[in-house]
Amino acid sequence: MKNLKQPIVAIAVLSIISGSPIRAQAQDDVIFKAMKDEMDRSMKELKIKGHEAPYFISYTVKDKDIVRIAGSFGAIDSKNIERDRDLNVELRVGDYDLDNTRFSDGGLFGMLMGGRMARGENITVDDDYKVLRQSLWSETDDAYKDAIEKLEAKKAFLQQNTVKDRPADFSKEKQVTLVEQPSRVMCDETKWSNTVRQLSAVYKDYPKVDQSIVMFGLDTLNRWFINSEGTKTFSARPEYVLLATASARAEDGYVVCDSEIFVGRSESDFPTVPEMEKRLRAMGDRLTESIKAPLIEDYDGPILFEGEAGGEFFSQTIGQNFGNPIDPLGGGLAAMMGSTNPLKDKFGQRVLPTFISVVDDPAATDYKGTKLFGGMSIDHEGVKPEKLTLIDKGILKTFCSTRTPSRYVKQSNGHSRYGLASTTNLFVTTDATTSKEELYKKLRELGKQEGLKSVLVVRRIQNMFTSVLDPKSILMGMMGSMRKRSGFNLLPASLVYRIDVETGAETIARITPFNGVGLNTLRDIVAVGDDSTAYPILLPTTSQGDALSIVAPSVLVKEMDTQKADKNMEKAPILPNPYFEQKAAK
């Protein structure tokens, strides 16, 4: 087993998924007072001669308590316990129709996916009014100077270029006041260090598992937000995450990766340590068996994504692409990135079978006794979230939106997380469920129609965290999706079974990465199961946000294909792990 430095990347990624708490705060505390006073002064007095004054300012202060503990093979690899506070300033010059945002001058960092990248700066963690005012003043000054430069460049671009159907740059929304109770969590660092040691030691019993990492994270976020329109919000939430990832390498060099994710708003949401250990051992068993299985390459036929794999299938395809597609003006890398959404230009068209709908419900808290984690009472722009029917009987009806309008959605529906539009609790629903027995029967029938001797059932799919252990397979999957027009990226499978079309007998297998998922593939979904289940989803699109949830059934896809085998895979280590060599010698 390798004690990797790479998993530290995963710790950084895990940091992206949470938030953190602070000390007890009143509605009119020193932070709100400093924000309000500096905003009032800026709206009244901030102006450079010959240029417009700001028409809109918002301030966000996030106070975060962060605990990170990572371990492997029964030992702690890293530990990080910190508190920080940062300030984000959004300042707009011009008016709601035309301002300094949504313009790319060719660089990535001023524009991200057609939206705006929030300005951020670490500030004092002390509730010192004068120091807070100084930080607010300095950041506001920088934001204003940048805004007037961007607006001038944008106006020059519009004079030289014809832009048809340009939407407004900012939507007008209702003033909101919402103040929640502060979040305050005391972490038992010794307890969780021992838990990480115990759980990571599981893989001392699995010689074929050559890489593994167990990470615990507790983020507690308290968030202050005000804007010049009069909106004022305070939101708070803790989030616990325990993530275990592991991999094993087959003799042909292909790596099989898997993970287990546990998410909670409190320790009581977690399973017991013995229950988590049982699941980690099951993962070790799966990996050990999988690398012995034959590799199936260049497969073209039906695939059943069963159970949790069904949730990942929907999450990684349509789920990550419900953000309102924004077309930035200008050019360069940012403009190119802003047009990559496969659902773009499919508004009002069929993207799924007519028996499938997709709903996003920010107010949902549980599904059949399983807690959901994506809900929020207010979004990050101070807009109350709406329940959305994103896809109705297969037809794409709307997108999750922020206050940045698009050609499709003109108003915010309260789905902003750190400036990006995001889902919350996603429900894949159907009025035509199919039993497990019927799904398998249809799968075999489809295989026979294609002249196949066997078909595939995928029961687990990799997620973004397993890329730390197997970056090459992730890259191969991305290349596969790029080769497909309007393709979605689907990460490689972690657990696959081959089903004999005649007898129904199943044997464990491995497959090469998928060649992406095209819109035609989604439209040709044959059936979904009656087994809808809730799963926590940690998406990169949440930027710095929280865990989300998806409720989805198993799904039978009529036709998918996988790549040809890569003949240049890295081989297994020449010498065995010394731990297992010494253990065998005893």
Task: List where the protein language model places each region.
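Positively charged n-region of N-terminal signal peptides that target proteins for export
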Residues: 1-6
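N-terminal, helix-rich and Lys/Arg-enriched segments in bacterial and organellar proteins
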Residues: 8-9, 39
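Bacterial N-terminal signal peptides
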Residues: 9-19
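Polar low-complexity intrinsically disordered regions enriched in Ser/Thr and small residues
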Residues: 13, 22, 233, 256, ...
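Active-site bordering "gate/hinge" segments
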Residues: 22-381, 392-395, 515-521, 526-529, ...
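Long, low-charge, small-residue-enriched segments that form tightly packed helices used
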Residues: 381-586
